[in-house]
Amino acid sequence: MLTFLWKFVVFHFLIISCCLLDNVNPEDNLDIPAIAKYFNTKGRYEEVNPYLTEDILAVNGSILQPPSAQCQEIHLTAIIRHGTRYPTTKNIKEMQQLYNIVLHNASGEANWLREIQTQWTMWYTEDMDGRLVQKGVNDHKHLAIRLSKLFPSMISEENLRGGFIRFITSSKHRCVKSTLSFKAGLTELWAITDKEFDHVVNDTLMRFFDQCTRFVQEVDNNPSAVVEVNMFKQGPEMRSVQEKIADRLRVPYSLITHDLTEAAFYLCAYEFAIKAVNSPWCQLFDEVDAKVMEYASDLREYWKRGYGHDINSKSSCRLFHDVFRRLNKAAGENKSGQQVTEAVTIQVGHADTLLPLLTLLGFFKDSDALTSTNYASQTQRSFRTSHMLPYAANLVLVLYDCGGGDLRLQPLLNEKPVTFPGLTDPRTSMPLYEDVKEHYRELLQGCDFEAECQLFKHPAKV
């Protein structure tokens, strides 16, 4: 009788447990900070594609819907940001400053604060300075495998061994190592041990922003170019976040500057991105605070790399023309019946490489500019770097031959099809290549890097 009762209790316990598990919300995962989706360019790729948390190699081939079964890929260009990295030296110095305040000045009694003061140690060192971490290595290895599964006729062992896949990278260590990691993802996938594959360092393409004199002088090194950013930092939304942090720590308001507020946000973001830890630092922010921090970062990217100034996007003219030169070459070879000599181009750079190009192409442009005073009206904005530019962000352009000279171009951002702005077709996100070229005709005929980047005697106002 006791045995029967015991089995009855266990059976009902299992049923209840299963029911509870079925109702678990993935967003309630305590290992993921509640504010993780607001980390801007410091965010994980998995926050943009949450299904990867269950299976990092998962792909969904059904997202590619060519207008006919005849369509075959003939060329693929991927422009990819480097993987997860350490903070820069500047950020690390600010983190150390904040940590010292928390250790010596904070008098709050919350458990998370005691954890920082007694268990957490400042493990970031200045020599780390933006270098790739192991997670960043894995970001590119896994991306290589997923893209090879999504486009098996392009990113194939045959094309790799045949020299039809080309690798180009920025000279920065984190980009070179990301490129090596992408290649390793493929060679390990196909167990290639008898051959190595070269890459080319090309800062002219992948760090064009450093070489555009007008951009450097008028925007990058010009405080007046980011006046909206600085005004927002001094505004009521940001002041509220700083005061709430000071209250949580129980320190004077004067100790928590904007830079230290940003350092606290980065501590949460880096701990999660690098170590997959929901750090006690994350408790300094609620969702309202995180949205303000996200907007402050978006505002900076908007005015320094995005739509804020015309030269921001025009600095990417070289890369823009290079992409279309490759597409035209592939189209020409295909039309004449030749094998496409550069089937795949993998180009690894920075968020600062991708954002000006996305801007030049017209992606994520809102009807109103982002300013210091319209935070409340921009809650539904398209321009959100948390969605656009996580670590390992990628813009992939795939050229298809659909038969009878019908060439089509499919853009994907972070492995999701997107539509070229101004080329909306409800039937497909894969427009005719000729229509794409016509849409960007003015840029293809103009957009001269040397002319755009020349520093005039009387620079344009910013």
Predicted stretch roles:
Residues 5-22:
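Cleavable N-terminal signal peptides of Sec/SRP-targeted secreted and luminal proteins
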Residues 23-166, 170-462:
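Signature for phosphate-centric chemistry
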